[in-house]
């Protein structure tokens, strides 16, 4: 029997004589504690005492688990995650990579469960606590279950039960295994709830502890089959009386603590803590989501819920707390009334209560914004809730939710979420058995169904156990949920029953049937109330889920049908799904491979789920993502999971994004991001699939060498993980993939996601945004803050969440790289595979780790749909999650050709490794990885998001770009416009950037101008995008996503690049800005993508890439958007291939490069303005022309765009190239654009690249991919940003090389912002980009002096990147610094070249050409040179040039002529 000791409530926490209660805080604190998956979090992690203050509500930090206490309970120690327990948000405390819920989440969650310790019995903070507990419950119980649960002393139990009310913790303590939760009341009034989880020795399910509050979640985890039951209910529980009664009380308490939910639970849950769990699920769901592969779904759902939870769910949860937080007395009364038979459900009871009724009824009406939010998330996010299930599930969930949601008023989302979560748990539990093993089990079925359509996806995995437990718990929980819904007036019979096959059994389920008290049994008042409620609910459903209203059932059913695999995939990404989110989560998984495995399937997921606190956001973001696409449910929390398909999309998730991402932190940190990300994700998702495919492809491309092997490895890993997971009792279809994620050292992890994604893969492609690639996603979806479209943008938080997801991307990093960084990444724990993903998270800048989330967010936000998601999600887990197929399909769609073409091995691409690893390889993200620390990052928000971004960023993004073609990815937020404002630097990187940016000032101005220009340029991003990228580089980073969107191939790449470093970095601080990246969106798939209306750039992809607008905006997230908006506005204007108009660079104003002047001055320091000020593109023309020659070569696929370019979709890719201005330009359809970009790149390059490290990479990727010189050329600017990615994508590298060069130029900015954070870091950035840097470095060589910076980068983020192996040279560069730089460049080139092989060479040459026009147009070259000098005023142009030259010559030798961005070079030329 596993006894999970939850951390005490803060007050409780104070060691108390009755340490038994060390778990005391189980309920309140628990959530946090449980948050970690059940690995020995308690003892290991838990022991890490979280400092907790006596707090009525358990704040994550408040919760503290005394090591002794933790260890006291064998279960606790067993459940690693639980240990983190109290530290959900604040907890960070997971010691061994334990995931902790993000504080946001936790806090939210905490409320409910925690119910203030002091008045735990009386005061329920909110249902959140339960959720938290649920998270806690997630704790894996494998071994734990074996251990005897520490039985709470009878007295304690009694006390606990008494106190339990106050806390929901007591309630759903049970997880997969029946566990009884004993809460004991401490003298301090601190509830100590000792959750004795006893693992029911079930044949299939591995004992998984749900977070305390989640009865089901635990089940959901590995063993779908092992629903947690309160001892009373538990079949095997030895908790027995104590536990049982205690549990029951707790349940009751929980119910009360959590309010109706709890009461409902009590009602139902007395028998089923599950409901309690569900309640917890609301918040916990995320955790719940984490709970098992099935949970993956759940995770997805939960994550989604949470994700949105972070933005939506979480916020909503908080709202729910308010909504559902009734006085304890009221809750008790409700529970009593239910128990006494007066009411069938607590909700029913509450519905009859005027105050409650009014509150619930009026809640949404009074909070239209909330409804909108709900709606927003619904469309994108609501499904989150469902999404948890899977993208698909969401529909049903949505329907359910719809049904529930209205009723949510009463129970509110919370309930639905809980239900979903519960169901998800169940689903998760069952999910493993996709078939809805529990179908026969009405309860299980119902639960799944009800909460999520996911029910069907429930599955067999848990199969029998799941069924049993699910029956008990599920039934209970589900019935409770149903009851709640029914009480809410939702006609579950109709919806639930109708929609889910399982639901049909619902009729057979007494509890379910009993949910609705017959009207005849109601008093007239009650009846009236019910009618009113039903009407309101109906209204709500119509309002929120118009499409799901009645068709939900059908939709869900149909989707469920397809969802299962998908769902599984998406959902858990298999376990991965969750993981995916986790991917980023993986990060937490990261905590331990095992965790991941567990996590993926069960505990790992749980753990992930836990992370969700952090990750939740990310996850949420990702989830949002998933949401978007049904299939993309990949997005589904899965986010990773879903990301599978959407992985990229979810990813997008991202992410990561991405859907993230991935991770929650974004959510947590930047909830808004999350939301927006989620939205974006959704969009992305559509794209994502393509993206993911693309990404994968690109990845493959990038890792073409790995292609075949990767594929094989991927398969092996996948199988291996899958098997392990199954063995682990965490069976999940996706699990395998998920696990692979973990396992896969490089991209495998990410890829594992892919596997999961695979199912999604099918739909995504169709969905993929190829069509919408630039225009739709970008235009529509672009998260341009200014534009409503920015679904992606919706909420930075969301984005963040998504990003978080994406964060995992970094995992992609590549095991090696990751590994190295992993430690820093924290992901390391995740495992190579996961870690890899996480590594990506590492991204360029670890320092930014904190920011990553934001970046992720950005990325997510950037969602850019595809890119971001893919990136996000892919980058994080999402990418990984994408199944190779997914990738293919994803990449394929749009970039598929490119990708495929570019990517040597489709399979390779597909192989998770490729995309994931590749991206990681691209590592520019790797650096992020360090930040990755899954949970930390998630928590910190920085890494995850970043990672997600990063993760496959380059590759993924690139792929995505190709695939999403940008459009969708476009969304990506130019996370960092910050570079724009050097000082804006949301974070150090920006500062660094700033540092760099003396020049940066210029750059910033330029960026803004460029942004403006870019917008203008925006023509395809042509220059604009690039410019954006460049200027906004930082933004761009976000934009990466955006880029992705527009770029699609290129854009994505760029985005990645951006994302990777800058973005991440930016993202971290700029996360919101990153959103801007929507502007990224700009970029659209093609040049127009640049226009990417959405993108802040507006069209601009350049913008997008450029971040440009974003850039300007970048500094403030909003800014980002605005730029997008402005960008968008101007974007069109810029569109013309010739948008050089304003951009003209005059020799007289080289500094401004006129394009800067044109737009710059306004935008100058104004990130927002910059974006805003349209300012016609300065004379980018010269850049254009300058770039044109190369452009010509790369014309089609902006070097950056390579994906596109390589595809021949120069425009799109151009966008990508956009990342660097050049790349973007390249992207522009016309050469002109490209040229502009090229020109721009030169000019804006620095800027673009500023943020772009990754972007560069992307560009590189693209450039490299296609091998476009142009690409490279453009890439150069792009490279600056994308360099790393390019480097990462050596295959593509060739083109990338130039981008690299560009990157280097850009690097400075980029680095500052992103990579190294060294202003000087151009190189750093480049370095980050690694291959790119030097390549770019040459170009950027002027910055070369910054080589040192590069060095810095290497240390921090670049290293990772290089780790990606993007270009080992890059790494070298990082490591070596100047000398290295060149060498790096060389290596970079080599890598690029080698990776790209011929591409490299070709690209390299072309890349060199990138500078191309330089020889052709000396005048231009000179102008450009001046411009650059001015741009990088800080460094002596000469110096920079020299360095650049040197590097170019030495590294760029391949691409020396054009490649060297060096103005001098140009001039010389």
From Swiss-Prot:
Q: State the superkingdom.
A: Eukaryota
Provide the protein's localization: Nucleus
Biased amino acid composition, Polar residues: 1-16, 40-60, 90-113, 422-438, 455-474, 770-781, 806-830, 844-880, 904-913
Q: What is its main location?
A: nucleus
GO molecular-function annotation terms?
transcription coactivator activity
**In this chain, where does the modification Phosphoserine occur?**
9, 206, 210, 883, 905, 911
Q: Where is the composition biased (Low complexity)?
A: 17-34, 116-130, 731-745, 782-796
Q: Where is this region: Disordered?
A: 1-131, 161-187, 200-222, 422-442, 454-474, 728-830, 844-913, 961-991
User: Where are the annotated segments for ARM-binding?
Assistant: 511-555
One Pfam family, please name it: BCL9
Phosphothreonine: which positions carry it? 11, 208
**Gene Ontology cellular component terms for the protein in this record:** beta-catenin-TCF complex; cytosol; nucleoplasm; nucleus
Q: Which key words are in the record?
A: Developmental protein, Nucleus, Phosphoprotein, Segmentation polarity protein, Wnt signaling pathway
What's a single GO BP term from this record? chitin-based larval cuticle pattern formation
What residues form the membrane-spanning segments? none
What InterPro entries does the record tag this protein with? BCL9_beta-catenin-bd_dom (IPR024670), Wnt_Signal_Transd_Protein (IPR052475)
Query: Into which family does the record put it?
Result: Belongs to the BCL9 family.
| Assembly mode | Binds to ARM and PYGO.
Q: What function does this protein fulfil?
A: Involved in signal transduction through the Wnt pathway.
Q: What is this protein called?
A: Protein BCL9 homolog
What are the leading ranks of the lineage?
A: Eukaryota, Metazoa, Ecdysozoa, Arthropoda, Hexapoda
